[in-house]
Amino acid sequence: MTSMTTRVLTGITTSGTPHLGNYVGAIRPAIQASAGADAESFYFLADLHSLIKAQDPARTQRSTLEIAATWLACGLDPDKVWFYRQSDVPETTELMWLLTCVAGKGILNRAHAYKAAVDRNRADGEDEDAGVTAGLFMYPVLMAADILIFNAHQVPVGRDQIQHIEMARDFAQRFNHVYGREFFTLPEAVIDEQVSTLPGLDGRKMSKSYGNTIPLFAPREELRKLVFSILTDSRAPGQAKDTQGSALFQLYQAFATPQESAAFAQAFADGIGWGDAKQQVFERIDQEIAPLRTRYEGLIAEPARIEAILRAGGARLRARYATPLLAELRDAVGLRDLSSQAATAAVHASEKIALPVFKQYRESDGQFYFKLNDGAGALLLQSDGFASPRDAGQVIARLKQAAQASDLQLPGVHAQVDADVVLAAMDALREA
């Protein structure tokens, strides 16, 4: 496997049974993207993350096997990408602790999943941390370690995960600053605005929470029964039917060529009967899924083969990336061979990565302005003009105490980035 310019890391949830919506929206496009020659792709089974919710050991093991078999059956090539199990790279959890020691608790308090749990408890009149594990609270640090252990440049995520990438950047910047070198690349979130979603059996988005899914590898007859159970209206054969909003048409379109979709749309206009339409949808889906199903059944019958693939991927990755980086980081923080005579001189402040900084200045209009830049010079906040430097300074003082997004909403102050990024900068200034 050759080293490439851009490292792209994708985490794979190891819980639940994959359904057609997962395949169309995530698995198929990710595998297609892995074939690109301009990226070094990392795919990992997030089995450690699953322990936050899953406490059935047998189910955890089975789910990991099923998800691994699914991705391999769908075409992921472990000879062309890095495919591994999170728990097979112990350097990840060691890095998590190193990051924990520089991570601000304030930024973790603002993590969406933790805040949502606290808000539910408050609404129910419970202690705000009732039922909240340290695993849930520390989830963003483990996710940061997943990314930073391989210095990934890009992480494809949904919009609900952007905050975690911003946190990973913050932890990386803090570590770089504290230990005086740029050990970590700052990762970027990659948002696919064209993510495909499929309707479920009831017409709503296909989702486990709605109980309306079609399992990806359902046996052929089960697949047929499920497709024929999809809700349709009462229009009879011979009556024109709308493709707009039709779950059947959307399912067909997700598996068909543009020419096939056009022909199916014409059949709708010509009044195809719902039974015939469902038969065509079933046949078109099964045409693509049947060979994948066969491969999946072969793989799931050979768990030792899957285990060997995952272990080999983890071992190669450790040797190539994780072990050398951890050795460097251990030395950086002082976890060293006690017999070593290596120099231990402190890094000069001038060599350290710069902190965020407020800059005040006067413009030609006679007004006093300020802005907040991060350590790399990127603009985070910009003010309007103030009558005096004292007025501007008072606002800066209030901003430095900001602990939540509402604290940033001051007259004459304009955030140029997400509030979480600005709040992380304030945390860094307070802890410096």
Swiss-Prot record:
Record: residues binding L-tryptophan: 146
Gene3D superfamilies in the record: 2.30.29.80, HUPs, Tyrosyl-Transfer RNA Synthetase
EC number per UniProt: 6.1.1.2
Compartment(s) of residence: Cytoplasm
Gene Ontology cellular component list: cytosol
Locus of motif 'HIGH' region: 14-22
Binding site for ATP: 13-15, 21-22, 158-160, 198, 205-209
Pfam families, A to Z: tRNA-synt_1b
GO MF assignments: ATP binding; tryptophan-tRNA ligase activity
GO BP annotations listed: tryptophanyl-tRNA aminoacylation
Motif ('KMSKS' region): 205-209
Keywords: Aminoacyl-tRNA synthetase, ATP-binding, Cytoplasm, Ligase, Nucleotide-binding, Protein biosynthesis
Coiled-coil parts of chain: none
Leading EC class: ligase
Assembly and oligomerization: Homodimer.
PANTHER family: TRYPTOPHAN--TRNA LIGASE, MITOCHONDRIAL
Family from the record: Belongs to the class-I aminoacyl-tRNA synthetase family.
HAMAP family for this protein: Trp_tRNA_synth_B (MF_00140_B)
Biological role stated in the UniProt entry: Catalyzes the attachment of tryptophan to tRNA(Trp).
Name of this protein: Tryptophan--tRNA ligase
